[in-house]
Swiss-Prot record:
Native species: Homo sapiens
GO cellular component terms listed in the entry, alphabetical order: nucleosome; nucleus
Job of this protein: Core component of nucleosome. Nucleosomes wrap and compact DNA into chromatin, limiting DNA accessibility to the cellular machineries which require DNA as a template. Histones thereby play a central role in transcription regulation, DNA repair, DNA replication and chromosomal stability. DNA accessibility is regulated via a complex set of post-translational modifications of histones, also called histone code, and nucleosome remodeling.
Oligomeric form and interacting partners: The nucleosome is a histone octamer containing two molecules each of H2A, H2B, H3 and H4 assembled in one H3-H4 heterotetramer and two H2A-H2B heterodimers. The octamer wraps approximately 147 bp of DNA.
Tissue spec: Expressed in germline. Predominantly expressed in oocytes.
Subcellular localization(s) per the UniProt record: Nucleus; Chromosome
Keyword Nucleus attributed: yes
Protein family: Belongs to the histone H2B family.
MF terms in GO: DNA binding; protein heterodimerization activity; structural constituent of chromatin
Keyword Repressor: no
Primary location class: nucleus
Protein name, per record: Histone H2B.N
Amino acid sequence: MYFICLNDLRFPKNKTELYFPVKKKHEWANSATGKKRRWRKKRRKEAYFSYMGKILKQIHPDFSGRSWVLYALGALNAWQLEWVSLEAFRLSFYNHRRAITGREILGAVKQRSSQKSF
């Protein structure tokens, strides 16, 4: 049996302390990804309306016979316009498309106009 002599070894008196500076609520996530988060503002009616108008202008530049869609979109409240955009997203999902096209927007407006609350 062997005994180990510890007389000559010196242990540090003070333990090493790690100091972590206090970070704010969302800085931990930022430091983990290395990017700053950009907080999105609440979307307004104008954002939905301009986006759908741009899509419809790409598909139908002259709007011959399609101007009722813009009138219908302009007459909607914010929550109704959000409903139409969600319905257009559902239609694009069912058709296995990643982007919302004018066909989905027209279909969503037709579905919404067929209901009595429109």
